[in-house]
Amino acid sequence: MSDYIVRATAADANIRAFAVTSKEMVENAREDHMTTPVMTAALGRLLSAGAMMGAMMKGDKDIITLQIQCSGPAKGLTVTADSHGNVKGFAMNPQVELPLNAAGKLDVGGALDLGILTVIKDMGLKEPYSGQCELKTGEIAEDLTYYFATSEQIPSAVGLGVLVDKDQSVKQSGGFIIQLMPFTPEDVVDRLEKKITEIDSVTQMLDRGLTPEQILEEILGDFGLEITDTTETRFHCDCSKERVSRALSTLSKKDLDSIIADGESIEVKCQFCNKAYEFTVDELKEMR
């Protein structure tokens, strides 16, 4: 199993935790979207978060979407995940080039800058659940911590990291989400808060070769950690010519007529994976 998510509990089920390794998923996204290192890190962090938040969904057909709209040069990010470990995503501007930040790290916060994080959960109900918060730092992990606290009222610790190699490929990628359940004893809360301040960053843990299980062991080993589930995860786009055709057929007759009048076949690319689909003039005429 290459990329996978582990789910766990600790402190007599007062703590629930998720951790993921996502190197191949993020490398696939990098290759599909030809992202620069800073955008590989930005999209990679959100893909890791999406994978874990997808694993929180209970229904077979549940879908979660994480959207960031921002004022920085990245312009925005979108990630969609299901409850089976299938994740896809894209950056509005995958070609952002920025100098390293003051700490000598890839400047994800600079690429995103100010903005809004929106989480949409489609659980097959009439209306999807939607929660929103402002970006606190643009570094994504802190923004999600803030989202969980304000929109879902769940005290959480989120850690996300992507290591980019000298050749711009993904060296390591992963993360964790640790959440406190209601009525967690105060001493457990205090001990966990202290522990979170003492641990290495996710990138340091990944660079040491730690697996998701070992990352959770490092954080929750003193809390009676119990791994409850392991799920494979991957970058997977479910686009098809039929789906793209359905999207095209929603264009107005005027717009379709204009495309047809050009007399040439058109190429439409999937935003999530960059796969190109060609439609002939005859195919376009059938959509009117």
Swiss-Prot record:
One of its GO terms (molecular function) is protein folding chaperone. Under oxidizing conditions two disulfide bonds are formed involving the reactive cysteines. Under reducing conditions zinc is bound to the reactive cysteines and the protein is inactive. Disulfide bonds join C237-C239, C270-C273. Gene3D superfamilies: Hsp33 domain, HSP33 redox switch-like. GO terms for cellular component: cytoplasm. It is found in: Cytoplasm. GO terms for biological process: protein refolding. The keyword Metal-binding does not apply. Pfam families: HSP33. Keywords: Chaperone, Cytoplasm, Disulfide bond, Redox-active center, Zinc. It comes from the Bacteria. Its main location: cytoplasm. Belongs to the HSP33 family. Redox regulated molecular chaperone. Protects both thermally unfolding and oxidatively damaged proteins from irreversible aggregation. Plays an important role in the bacterial defense system toward oxidative stress. NCBIfam families: PRK00114.1. HAMAP family: HslO (MF_00117). This is 33 kDa chaperonin.
